[in-house]
Amino acid sequence: MVTPHINAKKGDFSDCVLMPGDPLRARYIAKNYLKNAIEVTNIRSMLGYTGRYKGHRISVMSHGIGIPSSLIYVKELVSEYNVKKIIRIGTCGTVIEHININDIIICLGASTDSKVNRLRFHDNDFSSVADFYLILDLFNSANNAGIKINIGNFFTTDLFYVKNDKLLDTLQRYNILGIDMETAGIYSLASELGIQVASICTVSDHILKKDQMSYIDRESNLNNMIYISLEALILKKV
């Protein structure tokens, strides 16, 4: 069924979907990792593809920037296309000294400054956590490949351009490994919809060290994260 934001037909998506924020990253994954990949949606230049990875049917669909955008696509994929498992593959910032650019972080749970979860959870705090078994699959996938990962909590923010030293100090004190703009919202919606979800991000910005990844690398130099995620999706199907 065509939705206001996705023009794929029923059955065009696998029940397992990788979701980067960047449409160009979705295209990169489809071209470089999936066999016989076809474009199944392109409304508003939000690209989605379905193909085969090691014989298994996998889809990749971009979700845009921020909680509101990402929740639109997650909701429609689950409600209209019967998606059961989603891995968000993105980039994130950090304020943790031992974390560096290009390091990979698997997110266990995410706090947020967004009002979205409170609006949906009757003004109460919602515990936004990943699916345990999908986290375990990501961990085992990385371990099998010998790829170093970090596992910990995220802070999801509505504001990309903001200077708040007190907040950064708090994130350090609570050992918040990653800062992004989507995970807390995606985790809460996945809980409501009853699907498996996890978020894995490559560090693109170190806020304290004032170091950042180039825009080219943000599109295409995330191969370890992509490989871990694809392997995790098929781990129990082998």
From Swiss-Prot:
Active-site annotation: D205 (proton donor)
Site (Important for catalytic activity): R218
GO biological process: one example: purine nucleoside catabolic process
Keywords on record: Glycosyltransferase, Transferase
Record: residues binding a purine D-ribonucleoside: H5, D180, M181, E182, S204, D205
Family of the protein in this entry: Belongs to the PNP/UDP phosphorylase family.
Role of this protein: Catalyzes the reversible phosphorolytic breakdown of the N-glycosidic bond in the beta-(deoxy)ribonucleoside molecules, with the formation of the corresponding free purine bases and pentose-1-phosphate.
Protein name (record): Purine nucleoside phosphorylase DeoD-type
Source species taxonomy: Bacteria, Pseudomonadati, Pseudomonadota, Gammaproteobacteria, Enterobacterales
